[in-house]
Amino acid sequence: MLLYLPQIFSSRASSLLFLVPYLLFWENVASISTCAERDATIQHSLEKLLTLTTFMSHVMSIETAKLFTEFNNQYAQGKRYNDRIPGTCHTAFFDTPVNKEQSLGSDPKTLLKLVRSLLNSWTNALNHLVNEISAMQGDPSFLFSKAREIQAKFDELTTGVKTILSMIGERDNDTHLAWSGLSSLQSSNEDVRCFSFYTLIRCLLRDSRKVNTYLEVIKYQIFNQNNC
């Protein structure tokens, strides 16, 4: 029996973990590759899952902004990190649309695969962010808690995107870009360590906003253009 998605979506406390039976159902359904081949029920279910996934990405970007703001307040005051030449984000080498208008001109399947690759690329980095931020001087308890919350949302969002790919007849992919900044997060030089955290969280915020934008565009394309 399928879960009633509108009821799940109505609660901000809900997460994609409540959709596990629904997601497992889709893993055992033969994927249908085009919108024209789908019946109305399947298309409606796809739209509901897209709505929930897009909402989750919006929440994730908000929580990441809170993490960035709090880190600035606790560890970056007076250090003028924003004036330094920023480190390159490890996901910068993906060929991504530069703005929402360019995203609207992208194929939704290609855009969805890009979202999956961005999420994949943060698995290792987020794990180390959570582990290392707890060792920061002072009281990093809020930062640690928020980082764990964001990591959980990334995992849930990845599950949702993986399921949507299956629903539209696309194979899941493990494409990702490796992160190699652990030594900087563990540096004995406090300034190097703090700036590395600042850069990593800034990149996380950048990518969480990209993921939200791309999912909003994909939802618009499928809802309004019946385009898959």
UniProtKB/Swiss-Prot annotation:
Compartments it resides in: Secreted
Official protein name in the record: Prolactin-2B1
Example of a GO biological process term: mammary gland development
Keyword Disulfide bond: yes
Keywords on record: Disulfide bond, Glycoprotein, Hormone, Secreted, Signal
GO CC terms: extracellular space
Glycosylated residues (UniProt): N173
Keyword Chaperone (UniProt): no
Entry's family note: Belongs to the somatotropin/prolactin family.
MF GO annotations: hormone activity; prolactin receptor binding
Disulfide bond sites: C89-C194, C203-C228
Secretion signal span: 1-31
Coiled-coil intervals, chain numbering: none
Pfam families named in the record: Hormone_1 (PF00103)
Reported tissue expression: Expression restricted to the placenta in trophoblast cells within the labyrinth zone.
